[in-house]
């Protein structure tokens, strides 16, 4: 990691349909090999399914899902005198959002439905209702932090 120059933050353009910057980040995370139109089709298709199944605004469901998946605390390894401790630390806001997006997509890809549209919509609905693998991942992270609470004084 360079000490001299840090990478400058690029401006992310809000998506065309809902005008949401976080949704654009979500699409960019879903995207493979630069195929943005495919990622858009997947996300918008999933949102249409969410709207028809839940009879709710898909953006609200998406925000609720992200809030339910975002971790407040995580463990980081810290080496002290030959021993490695898992030290619980708070998660910065940007990293919270990035982890929530990453975990939602991983959980959706790990589901058994036929298409990615169906998998993503099911995972979004589950996460919005505090169920599903993405929420389980957050719970596991919090459990690890709670178990290693004794090492919190090693925080840096």
UniProtKB/Swiss-Prot annotation:
The keyword Ribonucleoprotein applies. Gene3D superfamilies: Ribosomal protein S7 domain. One of its GO terms (cellular component) is small ribosomal subunit. PROSITE patterns: RIBOSOMAL_S7. GO terms for biological process: translation. The keyword Glycoprotein does not apply. Coiled coil: none annotated. Signal peptide: none annotated. One of its GO terms (molecular function) is rRNA binding. Keywords: Ribonucleoprotein, Ribosomal protein, RNA-binding, rRNA-binding, tRNA-binding. One of the primary rRNA binding proteins, it binds directly to 16S rRNA where it nucleates assembly of the head domain of the 30S subunit. Is located at the subunit interface close to the decoding center, probably blocks exit of the E-site tRNA. Belongs to the universal ribosomal protein uS7 family. This is Small ribosomal subunit protein uS7. The gene is rpsG.
């Amino acid at each position: 990691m360079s000490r001299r120059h840090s990478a400058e933050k690029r401006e992310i353009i809000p998506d065309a349909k809902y005008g949401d910057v976080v949704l654009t980040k979500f699409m960019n995370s879903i995207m493979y090999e630069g195929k943005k139109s495919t990622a858009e089709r997947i996300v918008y298709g999933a949102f249409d399914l969410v709207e028809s199944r839940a009879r709710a605004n898909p953006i609200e469901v998406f925000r609720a899902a992200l809030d339910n998946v975002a971790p407040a605390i995580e463990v980081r390894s810290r080496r002290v005198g030959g021993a490695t401790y898992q030290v619980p630390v708070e998660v910065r806001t940007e990293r919270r959002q990035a982890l929530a997006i990453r975990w939602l997509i991983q959980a959706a890809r790990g589901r058994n439905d036929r298409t990615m549209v169906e998998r993503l919509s099911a995972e979004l609905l589950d996460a919005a209702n505090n169920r599903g693998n993405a929420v389980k991942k957050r719970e596991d992270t919090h459990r690890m932090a709670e178990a290693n609470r004794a090492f919190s004084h090693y925080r840096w």
